[in-house]
Amino acid sequence: MRIAQHISELIGGTPLVRLNSVVPDGAGTVAAKVEYLNPGGSSKDRIAVKMIEAAEASGQLKPGGTIVEPTSGNTGVGLALVAQRRGYKCVFVCPDKVSEDKRNVLIAYGAEVVVCPTAVPPHDPASYYSVSDRLVRDIDGAWKPDQYANPEGPASHYVTTGPEIWADTEGKVTHFVAGIGTGGTITGAGRYLKEVSGGRVRIVGADPEGSVYSGGAGRPYLVEGVGEDFWPAAYDPSVPDEIIAVSDSDSFDMTRRLAREEAMLVGGSCGMAVVAALKVAEEAGPDALIVVLLPDGGRGYMSKIFNDAWMSSYGFLRSRLDGSTEQSTVGDVLRRKSGALPALVHTHPSETVRDAIGILREYGVSQMPVVGAEPPVMAGEVAGSVSERELLSAVFEGRAKLADAVSAHMSPPLRMIGAGELVSAAGKALRDWDALMVVEEGKPVGVITRYDLLGFLSEGAGRR
């Protein structure tokens, strides 16, 4: 009889599936390694086994111990799945951008989940890295796998993922494409494929725009489980031959296309990897065989990527899940009012109240965001907002001096609304807010007010 003794015995051996509809004519063959068919639903199952076994062997993890790990969800599921059989408790620390769906999965496996802010530096006491370190110090018998520095992560992909790809393609693979998060997958599987092919296989990393791997400064992005704002020890930068930066917008759109056109319900980092793989396939030509690793499934993203309202709120929505078309949008209102305005009228926390009032008056606007970088900025880099009325009142009432920093007198950030949302949604939001910050593809692009909406409607909403 063929009966596994535990679900963890079924980790690995995931299939390759050819992509068809999303691949352009004349491009190379693109085969997806479908890692969501692991029992825990992701490629992180592989590293969980290796890390726990190594910790047990070294004595770092003792019977009845507690596993503490900062994770975007998938590593936690893999660790919980293996730990459950071996009697360990699990405490996982997640950034707040991780979907509630994914957090609930961890809880379902019996883990405790601690949520921390995303938009803070790695060494900030509130970051999910720092909080996990503190928990390890505070909990007796705690062990932190630290997937970002644990050599067993890359090793697991070197001994399983890489050999599986080589065997299943009969050594004909020409390119391997994978997203870079901790760096373990591309380091381990990529190193194996380079070695076994004598350097013939080209290794390509896919990375979110803003991540350090592709030359960014670690600026915020919304795709989960990939990219970083620091350099993990598990990542070997000598392995990838090329790294392709992919926007959140392109990643999410491809993720939705994979469900509609390829019947693959996968996560956002999978869409990102496929965007990069298709670029490689077009450049490599029809004789190439590109293997792209799809690390997880899409059921943990139903409230985000596969939710039209969430996609629209960030300005990512290109087509609705039901295929319906939209009428006049918030983006139309912004384009109608913009005229000669710069891309985003803004000020910075370090600028003075005098500077901010001058900017508001120069461009004839009543409110603007306070941002921590120069445009184009990400939504997570918006620190607050200022209005001409509030600043002038503060100055005349003696609560503010013109030489004060804006940071001392700014209000909370304006409510965000996606450029693709309907004008009716803006009308409802403006009942409670004087102004709204418009975001497109996750980036703030302007501000609309009640006055702007009334002007748009009075001039004829249908005129574009």
Swiss-Prot record:
Cofactor(s) required for function per UniProt: pyridoxal 5'-phosphate
Covalent cross-link Isoglutamyl lysine isopeptide (Lys-Gln) (interchain with Q-Cter in protein Pup), where: K428
CDD domains recorded: CBS_like (cd01561), CBS_pair_CBS (cd04608)
Phenotype when the gene is knocked out: No change in H(2)S production, no change in basal oxygen consumption (respiration rate).
GO molecular function: cystathionine beta-synthase activity; cysteine synthase activity
Family: Belongs to the cysteine synthase/cystathionine beta-synthase family.
Name listed for the protein in its UniProt record: Probable cystathionine beta-synthase Rv1077
